Amino acid sequence: MQETLLEFFKKTGRPHRLEEILHRFGLEKREAKAHLKALVARGLLEKKGSRYFLANRVQGPLSLHRDGYGFVRLPEGDLFVPPGYTGDAWPGDLVEARVMPPGRDGRPWGVVERVLKRARERLVGTLDFRKGRALLLPDEPNLPELPLAPEGLEGLKRGSRIVVQVHYGKRPYGTFLAYLGEGEAPETETEAVIAKYGLRAEFPEEVLKEAEAIPLEIPEAELRRREDFRGLRVFTIDGVDAKDFDDAIHVERLPGGYRIGVHIADVSHYVKEGSLLDQEAFLRGTSVYLPGRVLPMLPERLSNGVCSLRPGEDRLVLSVLVDLTEDLKVKRVRFREGVIRSVARLTYTEVEAFAEGFGLPEEHAFLAEDLRLLLDLTQRMREKRLKEGALDFAFPEVKVEVGEEGELHLIPQAEPKARSLIEELMLLANRLVAEYLVQKGLPGLFRVHEEPVQDAYEKLRQALARLGYTLPPKLSGHALQKALLASRGRPEEPVVAYLVLRS
């Protein structure tokens, strides 16, 4: 009945007296008052005098400033919450706030009335002791110091990095869960990141057992069922320190054109829907790359074993075979379950050196012609995309390496031609797969970059004008690309790229 009453208030959009409710719904006075009182207690209705009306409340995540004020993040615009009105909420908590009448500045403001969902159950921080009491100094900014229960802290020193379980209430406190290390050593920071985001560092025993049960040899019947690409010069290009190789490529010259093959490791053959491996991969979502450490989505037997396209070993793949004309128009596309035997494992460094005019290592010299052709084709593909209005953001990529003594090194990734080769081929394959899914009405996950709305574009025009770049009044992809290219090598290049990306 309460939901029915609530819908009635929403539909009419005005206050109602108790007598109106009694007449409209034919309720007993005691029953009606009980339902209305419950709705008031739930924060859904308010009572003023003899009238009941919908509570003017909003829900959203709370951001807090160190000075005590905050904002409830809302799609229609953030709601300001003054100091002293944030309740017991912490940054990131999902809260319900009452919207108050506009103040002197003419803007409404809010009062946090309750926390709907906490943003965190655990905290990572540094252990401290004061006046005989243990405290956690959280890593996250704007979080309060948290008193700790003494259990589990025996033998730990001030400055230890730990993980605690947070117990909310009038007087929040934490209980010890795990010791991460001392100070700010890189390995301690890595453990802190794993703990903070709840990453799954280890595989459950039953998942590992399921992985171990997967045979290393491919059954003969499975090989016969698939298209055989083992006679082609299929190879991989990856980073120097890559451990798993999940995509491979090949190219062939055809009369009047070319054939490009993009071969992706067929993980779905080994990870069956609903299996323990599938469930664990679902929980992980992705492999996580940390400095000096990888948390793979699948156990090593798969990620570095049967699903890694290593040279000289038969591997199952899903392949996209694209026939192109001389001017790079798609003439024919085939999707196949296949088997490959990679002939080489190249690195971005080797391919970049080759693109700059140096030779390939002797053992890979037989791929020189294929590589030369692929570099030419993918360069032309890229130029074609840019002519059609695609945007090219030249954000530098940086790799983080950890030295033997724990020192961090930031190493720019400087293999633009080699990486562009792979990027163009993956873009081609993904676009053709997406077109196939749309044509067949099949469900799929699409990554879409929407065009800027005119208001955002106008703000971008004004911002770039202050930097000396002119954009036309009407949105134009070519004009945006022209501005990006004009800023290359100039001090404002990252600012221009960032503004265009944010628009």
Question: Which positions does each model-derived feature cover?
Answer:
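A sequence-level detector of short linear motifs
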Residues: 80-81, 332, 409-410
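Charge-lined substrate channels and their catalytic hotspots, especially those that engage the 3′ end
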Residues: 1-264, 268-314, 345, 349-355, ...
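Conserved catalytic alpha/beta cores of large enzymes that bind or transform nucleotide phosphates
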Residues: 288-387
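Short loop/turn segments at secondary-structure transitions that flank enzyme active sites
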Residues: 142, 180-182, 243, 267-268, ...
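Short, flexible loop/turn elements at secondary-structure junctions
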Residues: 238-241, 253-255, 264, 294, ...
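Append "with occasional cross-activation on large, charged helical scaffolds in nucleic-acid assemblies
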Residues: 335, 348-350, 360, 364-503
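Short, well-ordered loop/turn elements at secondary-structure boundaries
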Residues: 230-231, 244-245, 253-258, 284, ...
